[in-house]
């Protein structure tokens, strides 16, 4: 694996068409890192064409991340070849159809902080101990070339993936980066409020529904909720109206691990997992082809939801009981 050590601009200085993308169902870190990188490259390479491709994302991110309004939600034209393609906060198998254009690019750059990523680019910058992709992108940038827009995009991503600096991956480097970015004068408190704490009425109702329908397993240490399309249709909810539910579930007293699964479309389910101490949810998610971090992970389920939940429950229960010194029956 070629580790990215030089200035990223050196790797793409001769490129005329550069693509940027991240994982499916993009969150603030994914959108923030992609938009910040695009602004940075456009500033340094005004003659190059820089395109960001992502699935649609929360409107709050459009309002809080400069450049998010120009992200493309379509795909490049068939047969189009990029001089360079940058995969941020992701690996190609989590990028959806756009991964083909990453694979065919002359220069492939992968920047990620997920522990399950071993690097998939011509050049890679992978650090599973970093708080966010935005923290890694910040490390690769020339501080003198960061402006207010880039700073706000990076800060928003860091805030999102650290849960406002509360998750264990938050470190000294994270706080130093955030402190430097705050010097650019954007309204950081408004970003935290809008991106992390505010809920729409539909989101609030779906959170209430999820909490009411949750099961408590393993003496209350494992909280599980499954919502189908009928549950969502009752309030006209879409995927974006379910943001933050697993993070709220794991805050319940006595809970170490929370799993929230919802039916995204007929036969396709998405599971979001959170842990605070014992359970390695990245390990659990990997059993179904997903990934993430020790304390936050997820997966897409295209097989029987009953069988998939059985696999997840068995692994989580096994981890909890192993910590107690008991074998899983």
Describe the predicted segments one by one:
Residues 70-123:
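Active-site cofactor/cluster-binding pocket
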Residues 67-71, 104, 126-129, 276-277:
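Short, hinge-like loop/turn segments at secondary-structure boundaries
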Residues 27:
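Polar, low-complexity loop segments and adjacent catalytic/binding residues used for recognizing
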Residues 2-24, 32-63, 73, 77-82, ...:
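Hydrophobic helix-and-loop "lid/oligomerization" segment in the mid-to-C-terminal part
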Residues 37-38, 102-105, 126-127, 176:
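Glycine-rich, phosphate-binding/catalytic loops in enzymes
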Residues 77-80, 100-103, 117-118, 146-147, ...:
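Solvent-exposed alpha-helices and their adjacent loops that cap or buttress functional pockets
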Residues 111-177:
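Short alpha-helices
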Residues 30-31, 62, 95-98, 120, ...:
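Short glycine-/acidic-enriched loop or helix-start segments at secondary-structure transitions
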